[in-house]
Amino acid sequence: MPPFATRPLNSTKSHPIFAQIRRHPFILFGIPFIGIIVGSSFALQAFTQTRYDYQETKVKSVGKEEELGMKSGRRKIDLKEEYYFSMASVSQDDYEPVRVPRPVGVPEWGGGRSGEEAPMKGYRKEDRWV
C-alpha cells in the first residue's frame, strides 16, 4: 500500500461549485462585499437616529433669557447707539485739549523718522527745564 493517496487534496473536479467560483469570482468576492455594505447601512441607521435625536434635544434646551426669567421682547443693546446717547449729555464746550509731554528722544512730530525736519524732544532750548 502506498503511503500517500494518488488523488490530489484540492481537486476542482470533486465539486462543481468550485469550478463555477473559479470562472465567476464575483460570486466569492462581489456578493459578500455588497452584502456587508448594505447590512452595515441598516446597522448604522440606529446610531445616526440617536445622533439626530440628541441634536434635537440640544436645540430645544432652555435659553439664558428663559432661565433667568427675563422678557424676550426687550430692547437689544447697540453699542454705537449707547455711545452717542452718552456723548450727547457731555458738553463739547467744556472740553480742553491738554498736550501730554513726550519722553526725551522721541520726535516732536510723531513718526519714526528723526532728522532736521522733526526736532527731538530735549534738544531745543525751550524744551529744557534747567
From Swiss-Prot:
It comes from the Eukaryota. It is found in: Mitochondrion inner membrane. Keywords: Membrane, Mitochondrion, Mitochondrion inner membrane, Transit peptide, Transmembrane, Transmembrane helix. Residues 106-130 are annotated as: Disordered. The keyword Amino-acid biosynthesis does not apply. Its main location: mitochondrion. Residues 1-23 form a transit peptide. The chain crosses the membrane at residues 26-46. It is a single-pass membrane protein. It holds the Pfam family COX16. Residues 114-130 have a biased composition (Basic and acidic residues). The keyword Ubl conjugation does not apply. One of its GO terms (cellular component) is mitochondrial inner membrane. One of its GO terms (biological process) is mitochondrial cytochrome c oxidase assembly. Belongs to the COX16 family. Required for the assembly of the mitochondrial respiratory chain complex IV (CIV), also known as cytochrome c oxidase. May participate in merging the COX1 and COX2 assembly lines. This is Cytochrome c oxidase assembly protein COX16, mitochondrial. The gene is COX16.
